[in-house]
Amino acid sequence: MAVAQCPASCGELIQGWILGSEKLVSCPVEWYSTVEVTSGSPLTDERPLSRAMVDRLLQHWQYPAHLSQDIRIDVQSTIPIAKGMASSTADIAATAIAAAHYLGHQLDEPTLAQLCVSLEPTDSTVFRKLTLFDHNNASTQIGCEAQPQLDLLVLESPETLRTADYHRIPRHSGLQAGAAALQRAWEKVQEACISQNPYRLGEAATLSAIASQLLLPKPDFDSLLALVEECDLYGVNVAHSGSVVGLMLDRNRHDVDYIKWMLTQKKLTIHWPEQHLLRMVTGGVELQ
């Protein structure tokens, strides 16, 4: 038996046209998908992509394909689906590490990333460090220094959007229009990690969130920006291919109850009726 877990992401810190193609830096938070791999017949309600990952691993290490039928995958996750919280990446990455361990192997981060993108666009939550990642082909993997500590008030919307559907939206001109802002945002992410400055990270995320309004607009976005200013928060980040939004803050410094009250006053809870206060955590898949 082997058990592994991978964190969710509150959207992305940044996503857009950086260094010649669309890339992202995920925002890992303390909400996990936990996957147990054991011997046994497959569960009837298993997640298809987790099974696809096991099959991909068997292929990778040249095991006979029929072994898959003796491997049971049990995914335990309450991460919201199709809202930009990297639920699918968490499932398949945790499956990969648990299944690899079950088969007596280890996977390094670049190989894990490559296996994940072979199944679907992947979030950079698979890396321990904040990482600029080409989520379509894993060709770029640039890690940052240790990330500054902060919390996120994650605003959850009932709206859903499958990542695959987002990738069908024509967005090349919008991505190009935001390229200069995203280059600045990427530089600020690196500076924030070097100087351990959460405000700098918030500036980076806010720049990217503003650019994302051209591609997948969030409702009442100006009210969100005003709230960030009024409450002196670090910034706002968004799911660039989903509906969640994160208010970047410090639960010990900022008055979270007041912020929630402000969300109601500004009628922002109409769009985001659920809120979750979560720590930003280091990414990467951990064996349990």
From Swiss-Prot:
**What pathway does this protein act in?**
Cofactor biosynthesis; adenosylcobalamin biosynthesis; Polyol metabolism; 1,2-propanediol degradation
Q: Which InterPro entries match?
A: GHMP_kinase_N_dom (IPR006204), PduX (IPR012363), Ribosomal_Su5_D2-typ_SF (IPR020568), Ribsml_uS5_D2-typ_fold_subgr (IPR014721)
What would be an example GO MF term here?
Answer: kinase activity
List all disulphide bridges recorded for this chain: none
GO annotation, biological process = cobalamin biosynthetic process; propanediol catabolic process
Say yes or no: keyword Transferase present: yes
Which UniProt keywords are given for this protein, alphabetically ordered?
ATP-binding, Cobalamin biosynthesis, Cytoplasm, Kinase, Nucleotide-binding, Transferase
Gene Ontology, cellular component aspect: cytoplasm
Q: Which domain of life is it from?
A: Bacteria
Keyword Transit peptide in record: no
**UniProt: ATP binding residues:** P80, I81, A82, K83, G84, M85, A86, S87, S88, T89, A90
Give the reaction(s) catalysed.
L-threonine + ATP = O-phospho-L-threonine + ADP + H(+)
Where is the protein situated, by its record's location annotation?
Cytoplasm
Its Enzyme Commission number?
Answer: 2.7.1.177
Q: Which Pfam families match?
A: GHMP_kinases_N
The entry's function note states: L-threonine kinase that catalyzes the conversion of L-threonine to L-threonine-O-3-phosphate. Involved in the de novo synthesis of adenosylcobalamin (coenzyme B12) and the assimilation of cobyric acid. Expression of a cosmid containing the full 21-gene pdu operon in E.coli allows E.coli to grow on 1,2-propanediol (1,2-PD) with the appearance of bacterial microcompartments (BMC) in its cytoplasm.
Q: What is this protein called?
A: L-threonine kinase
Per the UniProt record, the source organism is Citrobacter freundii
Q: What is the lineage of its organism?
A: Bacteria, Pseudomonadati, Pseudomonadota, Gammaproteobacteria, Enterobacterales
